[in-house]
Amino acid sequence: MFFGTFNHAIDAKGRTSLPAKFREALAAAGEPRIVLMQYPHWRAVQALPQSVWNELVKKVMEASPLDARWQRNVLKFVSSAHEVDLDVHGRVLVPPPLREWAGLQKDVVWVGMGRTIHLYDRAAYDEQMSAEIPADQVVDFFRT
């Protein structure tokens, strides 16, 4: 599982270090690589362990090829996916189309989201986090 927020930099080649805690979690789960794709709700990159990606692909393959709405989503988001390996320094190379999609500049933020990880441009992340959540949209995680 992935939790926490980590500030990092991305270099001119598109390389950024995956936080050590995330690398440790991947190693403990026996996950050799991650899949990067467009995050559909914000301008961010979503990173999924290979096993989570495989679950997603299985769902996609079970969908009807005649469902236009589903196919549009597959075309938009699943087709943006790139399998990537970490280099010996624990860095990932974010492909140019994903850097463009998320507007990744020099400063980036890795955010653990439980089973997945998000990668944001720092300015976009700060803006997203400063926005108020309307009271009727707040989820009560502690309700029993």
Swiss-Prot record:
Spell out the subcellular localization from the entry.
Answer: Cytoplasm, Nucleoid
Recorded hits in CDD domains, A to Z, give: MraZ_C, MraZ_N
PROSITE patterns, sorted:
SPOVT_ABRB (PS51740)
Please give the name of this protein.
Transcriptional regulator MraZ
The similarity annotation says:
Belongs to the MraZ family.
What keywords tag this UniProt record?
A: Cytoplasm, DNA-binding, Repeat, Transcription, Transcription regulation
The main location class comes to cytoplasm
Q: Name one GO cellular component term.
A: cytoplasm
Among the record's GO biological process terms, what is one?
A: negative regulation of DNA-templated transcription initiation
Q: Which residues form the SpoVT-AbrB domain?
A: 5-50, 81-124
State how it assembles: Forms oligomers.
Q: List the disulfide bonds.
A: none
Q: Which organism is it from?
A: Anaeromyxobacter dehalogenans (strain 2CP-C)
Q: Which InterPro entries is this protein grouped with? A: MraZ, MraZ_C, MraZ_dom, MraZ_N, MraZ_sf, SpoVT-AbrB_dom, SpoVT-AbrB_sf
Molecular-function GO terms, alphabetical: DNA-binding transcription factor activity; transcription cis-regulatory region binding
